[in-house]
Every structure is written in C-alpha cells, then in structure tokens.
C-alpha cells in the first residue's frame, strides 16, 4: 500500500549541442550523460550543467554532413574507458573521450538497426539490415551470425505424448470443427516500424528478440541463450507490439498486445508462453507503446506511450507511465505527460542501472530530465479517535482509500475509491489533528482536488464504495465529498509541457494553505511555494491556487515533513542538511535545525523517509535511508530498519531480523534507543514482537491497538503489538473506561489482573463503576476466575517508571479476598438476584473458599425462589457451582453443613450412585444429634470438630474420644473442651505427657505431668531432661526423706556433669547432699574458679586452695599454652599450603588445563541440559518435607557436607578444605577469649604473674597473627566471586556456565559461605591490664 513519491528532479535545459538528439547513454562512474545526434556525441554533466566533451562523427566521415545520418546505439564501456557507437549505415565505432580518438572496429554493409550489449558487457549483439544477428565479444571478435528468422521452435520445444492434444479437448459451443480451424495470423500493427527489438535478461544468460515474421506479417518473440542457441519461440499472439523488455529478475518478458477493445501489457515466460497481463487505461487505437523499461530491481515498469494522430487540430501527447504490482494487481503510480511538438517531445528514456528509482528522460530540444522516486505510505496523521486511519493508494485515475479503523481489506480492494478525470500523482492528508481525514490529490493536469469528511447534502459521484458496499447493506461509514478542484497556474506555461512534474512534495499544512517544492532548471536551487486558495464566488466547484509567496533554498530539497501537533516544518537537502521552515513567519525564514546541544543537524546520508517526533522534551528529526539506516537527528541508531512509524508517544520499527519493535519516546534517549535496536541487545517484555519475513508498517490506528503490516507479496496482516495494547489499556483504566479495557483484554488475552493491579486504590474506590460498565454476569465471573495473588505489573506487564501504578500500591490485605469482598458487597447492593452467580463465584474464589456459605445460599434459593426476572433458580446455581468446584468436594462440604436436604440436592446433581450415599445418610439420620455430627466430621476428617461433638455425648463415649485424641494428636484442642477439675481432663493430660515423653520432649512432659498431679511421672521427666530445680520441687511435693533427697541430688549431679553443667551439679551437691568438697572439685573441673573459691571461703577450707585449686589453675594454664601452640602451628601450615594451591591453580588456568570440571555433586552445574543440583543431592536435601527439620539438623548436614572436602594434597577441592580448616581454627581461638580472661584473673590473684603474662602474650600473638592473615587468605577477589549471583529465577544453564567461566574457578555453590572470612571481635574484653 505504497505510492511512488517524487524525491527530486534534476533538469538541464537548452544543452548547446548540434543537430537533434537521437539517443543517449549513461556514464555511471562519471555521473555524466552521453547524447548522440546526427552530428556526433556530446557529454554533459547534468549536476554542474556543463558540456564536458564533444566528438564529431561527421568530420571523420562516419556520419553524412547533410544530417541524414542516425546513431542506433551508444554504450559506455567501463573496462575499456571508451564509448561504443553504432550508426545506421553499419559502422561500429570505438571512441575515447579523453583523447577524442575514433576507431572503426567493424562495419556491416547492409547497415545496423540495433546494437545491444549484455548487462556484463562481455557480449554485443548487432541486428543487420539483412535480417541477421551478429554476436561478438567485447573485443569485437565475431562469434556467430545467424538469421533472425528461424523455422525451428528452439531447444525448449514442447514434447507431445499423444494425449491432451487440442483435437481431443472440449471446445464448447464451437464444436469439434474448432479443433481443425486454421490459425489466422494478423499482420503487424499499422504504426509498427518493423525494426527488431532486443532485450537481455538481468544475468546476461539469455536475450529475446522481437521481429516481424516475413511469412505471417505478425511479430514473434524468440529467446536465445548466451551461446547463441535458439531456445524458444513465442506462441502466436494477435496484435503483438514491438516493445520488449525482459524483467531483470529473469521471470517474465514484457510486451504489448492490441485487442479488439483494449490494449494490454502482456508477459511471456522464457518458454514463449503467455503468463499474465494488465490493461492500459486507453481505448483501442488511441495510443501506441513506444517502449517498455524495467527498473534495476524489477519493481517498476515504465511504459512510454504516444498518442496516435486522429484529428489534425489536436496536439498529440507523449506519456510515461510507471506501473507497479502488488498482490497480483498492477497499479499505475505515476503519469508524466509530455507534448510531441517542439522541444518537449521525448527522444529516449532509460532507468539508471545503479539507482533503481531514477528515470532519465531526453527530450527533443536538448532538454534532459532525471526523476528520483521513492516509496512512501500516504496515511492520515491524526492521533485521536476521530482519525479513521486512512491509507490512500494511487492507481491511475483512482485513489483507493482504506479506512483501517473500521475495515481491514486486502489490496487491491479498498473501502472506497475516489475517481478523477486524470491520472493521480500525489496524495496528501491535512496535517491538522481534528481534520486529519481530509485529503488533497494532485493529478497529472496539475489540479488539486480537495476532499473533506463531513455532512454532504447529496451523494458524490466521484466517491465509489469498495469492499464495504453492497446491495441492501447499510454503510456505517463516513465517506468524504469533493469540496473543490483547484487549478495551479504557472507563470510560464511552457514549463509544464517541458517538465510535467514541476511541483513535488505537496504538503497540506492548513485548511487553505499548501506547501510545494519546485527545482530550478538552471542551478541546484529549490523553491518552496505557498499555495493559497483564491476566493471565488462564481464557481463553487472549481477554484484557483495562487502562489502567495515563495522562499528560495540553496540546495535541492528532497523531503519535507510537518508535525501536526507542533506545526513544525522540516526540509531535507540532498546533502543531508536539515532546515526548519518558519512558514508562519512573514519573512518565511529558513534556519538550520539544531539539536539540544545547539549544533546544526545533518544526516550523514540522504533519507527517503523523514518524520518529526518528541523524544523526551526535545523535538527530533527521524530519518530512514533506502539502505535501511535509521537516524535520529544526526545519530545513527540502527542499520537494519525496513520501515518505521511515529504514533503519539511511540516509535514503531520493523527490522531485517523480522521483528517489530515499539519504543516509548516519552522517557527515551538516543542511547536507550540505540541499545534497544542494536543487534547484540536482547529485547524483552513488550518492546519486541516477531513478525512475518519482509513485513512493513502501513499504519497504526490511533487510540486503538491495531498495527497494520504489509507483506512483500502485498497482503495485509493486523497485529496488536503488546506495547500499544498495554499503553491503551492503561489509558482506559486511568480514565475509568473499564468496559473498553476489559473487552480489549479479553479479546487479546491480556491477564485481567491488570485491571486491579494497575491502580488498586482506584479500582477499589470504583468497584460500582466497574460492575455497571461490564454489566455482564459471565464477564464478571471471568474476571473472578482469573484473579490471583501475583502482581502482574511487576511480573507479566512491567509498567513504565512514570506510571501511576508505582505511585499507588496494593492496600493492606489479601488481594483476592479484598476484590471478592468489595465486588460482592456492591453486587448485593445493586441487584443480588441478577448477580447471584457472580456472588457465588466471589465466595468460591476466596483464598479459603466459603463453600458452606455458597451452599447455604443455594439452599435458600430452593426454599424461597425469587420473583425477579433476572434471578436464577437453585438448580441453575447448583449446576454452575459444579463447574467451579469438584463435585466430591462440594458433596463433602454440603455434608459438613449437617443439612441432609442440601446433601441430597448436591448428590442428585453429581455422578454418585444412590446405592452408595443413601444407606450412609439413612444411618446418620438415626443417630443422636451430637454423635451424628461427630460421625460426619470424622468422615470429613475434621477431627477437631469431631471431638467437640463427641465430648457432648456423655462419659460413656469418652474412651472413644480419648482414642481419637491419641490417634490424631489433638491434645491441646481436647484440653479446651473439659474442665481442669474433671477426670477426663486429667486422663487427657497424662496421655499428653506420655506422648511428649515418646517424642523426647521431656521438660514439657514433666510440666504436663506436674500440672495434672502425676508427680512421679513428672519427677522422671525432669530427671531425664536435667531440670534439677523442678525435680527438687516435685520431690518436695512427694515428701521425700532426707536420704531420698541425697540420693536424688547425687543422681541429678551425675546427669548435670554429663551435660557439662558443672556449676549446676555443684549447687545440687551442696544443697541436697551437703557435699561441698565434691562440689569444689566439680567446679575446678568445669574451670569455674571464682565459684570454687566462694565455696572454699564459705566453708573455711583454705587447705583446699593449696591442695586442689592452685594445681588445677596451673595445669589449666599449661593446657591453654599447648592448645595455642597447636592452633598457631596448624594455622601457619594451612595458610602456607593454601597459597601454594592457589598459585598452582592459576598456573593451570593460564595453561588451559582447567577446562575439566571437578567431579562431584556440583558437576551438573556445567551441563546445559542438567539442573543446578544433582539428583542425589536433591533427594538427600529436599525430600524431608514431611518431617521436622530443625536448625541444628540443617547445620549438622552442612557440616557433614563440608567434611567431604579432603586436606590431602592434590585433592580437587583442597583449597576449600584448607579454607574450612583455617576458619575453624580462627573460630576456636575466638571462642577462648572468655575462658582466658577468667583464668588470667585467678593467676594474678594467686601471684602467678609469670604464667599469666606468658598466657596473655601467647594469646595476643595468636590473635594478631590470625587478624593479619585474614585479608591474605580471604582475598577480595574470592569474596566477589562467591558473591556473584550465579543462580536465580532468571538463570539458565548457559548463563550459569558463562558466569563460572568468567569467575575462573570451580567453586561449588554450596560452599560459597567458606569465602566469607570469620569475624574477630576486637571489642571483647579478655586482656587483664594488671599483667601488662
């Protein structure tokens, strides 16, 4: 759905050359044009408008002096740096333009009618006057000469196997005689010059020749290969014209055919068979086709037509039409009308071989024109809902308009057509936000037709409905009407005949103001014209556009774009300069466009598409070259962009990687766009979408989510880009347009949680608005069913940073319950009968489904059927519930209501067999109420409720209750049901205590026994756990004798010593057994020096100090010294070995020997197909979900795992084992501080100063050694490696592998804690200053 838009015009008038031009050729490397006349050659530079060279062929005798000579071909030879010229008299001349030397390389006596070079310039073909073809090499060595007329079909002759012949086919009403009719051959067309026509395929492997057959007088097309072997001959085609052009891509050969009532362009295949056609918009014998020309990329077919003289008074015209194909339909995109009189008559034209869309035209009066076109999509530019998203496609004298807001029809179909008396060349839409549907059309007669959307009193005959029309259908579409046709008058009318496309880049900026650009024919300058409508009271249908003002620009303007919001107009020159045109200024100033830094903007390469857009707070120029390079101002942000469009605050682009990317420009910057579009950047979320190969953007429907793409063949595809969808939904939600948002989300499968998560407070405050707008029970139920606790604005649809969703977060409470309760309250207040099913859904959807309430409501419906017409019956409600809840679960909950009518109602709707549930229900009905409910609760495994009902059944049922309590561990719940003074309470307490004893929870068991009066069992429990204080309390309650207390005390002391509670054991011995001597010995054994001295002095046994206390202190000091020496030696040895191991690993890594990963439980980390944790580890570590895992057991497990590290030299994880050992040494030494402090005090007290200083010095040296070594052992590099987040929810096997390779270490993840250095607390007081 693209049009050809005139890019620029290069014009060189009145070239000073002798005679009349006859043909021309291009010198692409020099950028010059070679023109041949009856006198010789002339080389001109159309850019500088200078004559470079002039070579006379008359002086050398190659052309006659009387001017009757003719040049039939000119070809620039790149590798020979010369020009080859063929004359009609038969001479082939090689001309060097640099030296102006002429060399006749060959001569044909019968004359030459055609000279045609192969595309690779390796071969040249000459058609002679004797109807022969001569093929020569590029060095003009003859290869072969053959007759141009051949009797044979060619090497590709079709093979007939006997069936399927014409004689055996059905011929309809003509009968069998049609099979035997003689083929009637029509002679060549009257205006045919009978000259042969030659065309080459793009790769130079074949060429085709069109000649008039001497036998039949009709034209035939023959195909030859590069070896000059005839391949095929075309089938007989009546009225075949002389024009011939082989499509460069090699698929088809174009020619013309005159039919009884029309004139067609027909296409031949290489085998000579016809393959498709299209009809020219002329009557029979109205025009003749002089030539057909394909452009370099085979996308445009130029048709050179000339009027046939019918009336002497009429002035014949010459026309050049440009045709393109899309979706198997041929479009007439441009029509250039020249006069055949005087200097404006076309002599020759050709496409540029390098620039595909550049057409060169040579006119009779030494007038040269070069037109550059580019593809453009003409679409309306509004950004509000009133814009219909119109796209206009030029097709001859029709403009096909498709309204994408209401209809999406594939081309060549359209919504409606605009009909014109002349072919259309340009279409432009009004750059006004509120009137963007109005359009203006410039046709080949330089008339501008203005169409406006609005009320029209009568049907417009120039507007014809397309795909939306039909008999008996009501058209719900606003079609435009022709407001007026304006004629543009030029100061020099001759200019229009010489250059039919005088005005280009037509832009409609205001309702009565047009901008257009023309180019100077004498210098590289451009002029911007202001076209304003002249007031005309006489003629309402026709008017005139006056050039109210003009502004000259030094340079060739190649693009002009306008921002409909800011009204900024930007010009682009051929050299890439960007200017801002102040069209509203009286002086019509033109100044350079500057970026935010104040520097002029200049595109590095000319851009064929330019747009204006606001990026952040800056208005920028966006440009796309024909080489897919995309620029923002003068910064190239991408080089793989195939199309782009600016809509509101979004920039949409399609890329060569078959993706469509959408960026929000509001908060974007050049760097973010460049990073997002770079090939190495991986886009996520709503930015990127995969599209079909070769897709291009057609338009974006404003205030909607539709993005229209066109495929290379021409068919359309409508996609809803996630970024556009979410942006539009957020706008609707901000405006409380819940219905529009809901319908869009439901259709495009957007998670409905976004309605709430976008702004929870606003939603909860407008629940009534939401329900009234949706107004559908099914839709509300759908919303309920999709609710989940997840915040989709953080997971699925992250909102822009500036979105209000970050300013208003979730209210306190459970999301699902909040929404369900809020909506249910509103629905019950509006119409509880209408929204009955939704109310039931709100109960079911809650975090803890309220099925009992739901069943109760259904039961109420059964008993009291509402009279409201919107109400649902109990049967319908129950049937709906069975879709939400499993029938067995619903049956169980109905049973839990103890309402047998409700149970029967649910059971009848289920698939249960009545033989299964009726006997059970009948049995229940016969039971006493409490025991019945107990039985139901036990059946439903609601044991807490069951024992509550059973406790009310009487003492005779207590044994059954106690057994259930023991089986289901319901002791705490059961104790709440009985009075503490009751026997049942005591029995349950004893059973509870025994249960705790079995679970090795001895202290709670003792407390439970003591509470219920079971003192003997309580004493046993306290003895087992070592709670000597409670044990003595229970002993007092049991009235123990003195001997019993002594025995109990010694037993307790023994258990406490086993638990290394020496102080507690000493206290028990002192109080119960009055054995203070044994108590002192226990205290000395436990290093409780001060407590031991207290007892010595309390009982005045100073002799014990000399006999026991002092020796114990000195022995302890020696032990501490030996321990410190051992720790210091171990620490130094491990540290030294660790440095050696690390150095060896670094050397191995540098040598590339660390590729193999150590075998072990983490080896699966490095496999692309394995999980992070191996199976055995998973089994051993995560299979305890049904058991109690204490912090201590987890710690012990980790400790056991670390012990797998071996300190054996050379082991794979030796460095980890050394780190583990060093950390353990440091921690053990740190834990000695308190013990050292206490022994230092008693050493000083008993005047053992030397031993105290020795111990204090040794401990201080050990701590300093370890503190100095910590940074060397636990280096920063190893800590960072361990802190790197290798694993996580977004990690993959490849990312984990890459992370580990970057770390250059094979450290298992489970041992990352080993890289955290142990802490040495300097604030801990251990040193005794008295010993300094």
Swiss-Prot record:
Cited function: Component of the elongator complex which is required for multiple tRNA modifications, including mcm5U (5-methoxycarbonylmethyl uridine), mcm5s2U (5-methoxycarbonylmethyl-2-thiouridine), and ncm5U (5-carbamoylmethyl uridine). The elongator complex catalyzes the formation of carboxymethyluridine in the wobble base at position 34 in tRNAs. Regulates the migration and branching of projection neurons in the developing cerebral cortex, through a process depending on alpha-tubulin acetylation. ELP1 binds to tRNA, mediating interaction of the elongator complex with tRNA.
Protein name, UniProt field: Elongator complex protein 1
Localisation per UniProt entry: Cytoplasm; Nucleus
Record-stated family: Belongs to the ELP1/IKA1 family.
Principal location class: cytoplasm
Disease: Neuropathy, hereditary sensory and autonomic, 3: A form of hereditary sensory and autonomic neuropathy, a genetically and clinically heterogeneous group of disorders characterized by degeneration of dorsal root and autonomic ganglion cells, and by sensory and/or autonomic abnormalities. HSAN3 patients manifest a variety of symptoms such as alacrima, decreased taste, decreased sensitivity to pain and temperature, vasomotor instability, hypoactive or absent deep tendon reflexes, vomiting crises, and gastrointestinal dysfunction. Medulloblastoma: Malignant, invasive embryonal tumor of the cerebellum with a preferential manifestation in children.
Annotated TM spans: none
Keyword Cell inner membrane part of the UniProt annotation: no
Classification via Pfam families: A-sol_ELP1, Beta-prop_ELP1_1st, Beta-prop_ELP1_2nd, HB_ELP1, TPR_ELP1
Compositional bias of kind Polar residues: 1164-1177
GO cellular component, one term: cytosol
GO molecular function: tRNA binding
Effect of residue 1158 to L: Reduced interaction with ELP2; does not affect interaction with ELP3; does not affect dimerization
Subunit structure: Homodimer; dimerization promotes ELP1 stability and elongator complex formation. Component of the elongator complex which consists of ELP1, ELP2, ELP3, ELP4, ELP5 and ELP6. Interacts preferentially with MAP3K14/NIK followed by IKK-alpha and IKK-beta.
Known pathway: tRNA modification; 5-methoxycarbonylmethyl-2-thiouridine-tRNA biosynthesis
